[in-house]
Amino acid sequence: MLRLDHLYSIPRDKKDINNICARMCLDCMRNGYIEANEKHTFSLLYEDDAVEFIYQVVKNKLHEKFLYQLSSDHVVSELELASMVQKAMNSTANVITISGDISRCVLSGKCFEKEYGVHAFAKPDEIIEKMAAYMLKHKGVFVEEDQLQLSWWQKLWNKWKWLLSVLVPFAENLI
């Protein structure tokens, strides 16, 4: 069993906003302010790192433990994250501090790292810069809910990529 700690990714449109980083970017663009609880700390795990971690588990047949916690072990507070978003978006948006209960939501990935020798490579500030750049470039998709304008080859790829995902395993079985 795998537990993923605060998984985040770069959203492609508004329906993909399912993590705190993307929500803060959207709030910054739409509302002009970002709300953050200064007493809430957590660890972020980027999707590429999660995929690598899961691959390592699937690749090995024998496991020392039943439960692994996948975490980047890079602890950040909501206030620090809001500051990163503000900087990445080149914004003068206000960061509104919300007082709440002290909470620390950090899973320890030490057992996984010890057994598999793998650690997270993604740096949250670099990924947030990429996320902010993408969301600002496609502001209409996120704020005004316009449709993402794709080129003809991207539309073709999106329509037919299922075929490739079926044919590759079929070809592997033939070989």
Please identify what each model-predicted range represents.
Residues 1-42, 47, 51:
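NAD(P)-dependent short-chain dehydrogenase/reductase
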Residues 167-175:
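Short, cationic, amphipathic peptide segments
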Residues 8, 160, 164-167:
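Intrinsically disordered, low-complexity segments enriched in polar/charged small residues
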